[in-house]
Amino acid sequence: MSVHIEESPTTDGDVITNYTINFGPQHPAAHGVLRMIMELDGEIIERVDPHVGLLHRGTEKLIEHKTYLQALPYFDRLDYCSPLCMEHSYVLAIEKLLNIEVPERAQYLRVLFAELTRISNHMLNLGAHVLDVGAFTPNLWMFELREDCMNFFERASGARMHMAWFRPGGVHQDVPEKLLVDIGEWLDTRLPELFGDAMSLVLDNRIFKQRNVDIAVVSKDDAVKWGFSGPMIRAAGIPWDLRKSQPYDVYDRMEFDIPVGTNSDCYDRFSVRVKEVYESAKIIKQCLAQMPQGPIASTDGKVSPPSRGRMKQSMEALIHHFKLYTEGFHVPAGEVYVATESPKGEFGVYLVADGTNKPYRCKIRPTAFSHLQAMDFMSKGHMLPDATAILGAIDVVFGECDR
């Protein structure tokens, strides 16, 4: 017995199948060079296949052919939205292998600028996120604040983005006192005003909530299984923060809260980052209040360069300077893994030294890679426009992801 199927006037008798589209790598919401191959059933996402590696530059291999100091600028170019936090893991790993003391002032300066970097990074991410879901104005205000952060970086190191300011043994140069005063004033005036205005347009906005609430809900167990870290795992309600659980530099002296979410959706991830901006401001204020006077780099002449004045008067200082910038310092054989709380999550550096002046191996543990691999898991069953909100909430930068 044959069943007669009436031919559909719309499909002309064809069987409707899922169709496959490319999202990126030229898509403005793809945040760089991400290509996602999506399988759609109408407008419902069935499968997402992220193709990464389009920004692969062989960083880990390049580092093996450079001295420890020459390898430092490569870290600025990993997550180029938060360069100082990339350097932080690397210099801490070298210091652990060298077993050297970092002066207190240098530690305070590092923590201060790491938190300023966190604010700068969140300004970019939160601004891009609201832009992705259709709000325009808040992004402009947050870019103003990011520009302020860039100006502070420039006044400290001479460069706006790729600072290379954290060095093994401390920081490269001391900051002018006026800069610290200006940062303190900025935290009390411009930051709360502009950021508060921007968030007042977004956080209680009905359209923004419709685009983010209950999108990409991830349970606590799943967040741990997928290897989430940073705001992604804190949004799931797990108060995991390396600055508290494994404090480095002077974070153990800082008083701050760990913002956590309850619903673990895109809105919670956004909210956690918003609260983190205020917590970072709290930490910076404590640094400004507690920061002592003193040296800003290790006194070991074999690791930190002498001042220019000493170099022009002392033969010994000149020799140290010459050796340091030609041959570099030798690091005793050993291996170490150091992770720091970057704005995007846990950024780790696994450094293997063989006793020479170059790293034998430097494995970089990126933050965004583990978040991006859950893209299929988070997007399934959602609509196509939700993918941009999910990607915005992940906060992915491909310099770091592809290495």
From Swiss-Prot:
Q: Record's Gene3D superfamilies? A: Cytochrome-c3 Hydrogenase, chain B (1.10.645.10)
Per its UniProt record, what SUPFAM superfamilies does this chain match? Answer: HydB/Nqo4-like
Asked whether the UniProt record includes Cell inner membrane among its keywords, one would answer yes
Into which EC class is this enzyme placed?
translocase
Q: Mind listing the GO molecular function terms for this protein?
A: NAD binding; NADH:ubiquinone reductase (non-electrogenic) activity; quinone binding
PANTHER family linked to this entry: NADH DEHYDROGENASE [UBIQUINONE] IRON-SULFUR PROTEIN 2, MITOCHONDRIAL (PTHR11993:SF10), NADH-UBIQUINONE OXIDOREDUCTASE 49 KDA SUBUNIT (PTHR11993)
Identify the HAMAP family for this entry. NDH1_NuoD (MF_01358)
Q: Which purpose does this protein serve, as stated in its record?
A: NDH-1 shuttles electrons from NADH, via FMN and iron-sulfur (Fe-S) centers, to quinones in the respiratory chain. The immediate electron acceptor for the enzyme in this species is believed to be ubiquinone. Couples the redox reaction to proton translocation (for every two electrons transferred, four hydrogen ions are translocated across the cytoplasmic membrane), and thus conserves the redox energy in a proton gradient.
What's any one GO cellular component for it?
plasma membrane
- Subcellular location, record wording: Cell inner membrane
Q: Where is the signal peptide?
A: none
Protein keywords: Cell inner membrane, Cell membrane, Membrane, NAD, Quinone, Translocase, Transport, Ubiquinone
Q: What is this protein called?
A: NADH-quinone oxidoreductase subunit D
The domain of life is Bacteria
Q: Which family does it belong to?
A: Belongs to the complex I 49 kDa subunit family.
> Assembly and interactions?
NDH-1 is composed of 14 different subunits. Subunits NuoB, C, D, E, F, and G constitute the peripheral sector of the complex.
EC annotation from Swiss-Prot or TrEMBL: 7.1.1.-
Q: Which gene encodes it?
A: nuoD
**Membrane topology label:** Peripheral membrane protein
